[in-house]
A protein has these predicted regions:
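Short nucleic-acid-contacting surface segments enriched for D/E, G, S/T with interspersed K/R
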Residues: 79-94
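Bacterial N-terminal signal peptides that target proteins for export
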Residues: 1-8
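Conserved hydrophobic positions within beta-strands
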Residues: 39-42
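OB-fold/S1-family single-stranded nucleic acid-binding modules
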Residues: 100-123
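Short boundary/loop segments of OB/S1/cold-shock single-stranded nucleic-acid-binding domains
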Residues: 21-35
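Short aromatic-glycine-enriched beta-strand elements
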Residues: 48-58
Length: 134
């Protein structure tokens, strides 16, 4: 019985590993493609865990398109210089996006340039060597 509890705990942790890894997969985003939206208008900024979200309206030749952009969690956002009020509805921003592979109007926000020229990473801070922080 003394061995059963620790072995059960280990088995449970190992069984959940796949679910945790699946949640953190970026496979839905095409990191080989980059879109740059020069004049995006912020519709909504969701300062929440497990991921912050940026909803923007992007002007196109056929009219505005709404995009939903995923960002990292709040810990990474804070380390990258974000605050809950860094952007608000109506703000004009430039945003660099890795779009979703399925062609929907969604993606991963990589770089966000605010109206004052300040650039913030949507995927967390960068190490001194230029590599993304883990």
């Amino acid at each position: 019985m003394k061995r059963l509890v620790p072995l059960s705990a280990i088995a449970a942790v190992l069984a959940m590993g796949g679910a945790a890894a699946a949640h953190h997969s970026g496979a839905m985003f095409d990191d080989k493609k980059t879109l740059v939206f020069e004049n995006a208008t912020v519709k909504e900024f969701q300062w929440s865990n497990p991921h912050a979200w940026l909803e923007v309206s992007v002007p196109t030749a056929t009219g505005p398109q709404d995009w939903s952009l995923e960002m990292v969690g709040l810990g990474g956002m804070r380390r990258a210089g974000w605050k809950f009020n860094s952007v608000k509805p109506g703000d004009k921003i430039k945003v660099t996006v890795n779009p979703t592979r399925d062609g929907s109007h969604g993606g991963r926000a990589d770089l966000v340039t605010l109206a004052d020229g300040k650039v913030l990473r949507g995927q967390g801070p960068v190490r001194p060597n230029g590599a993304p922080a883990e």
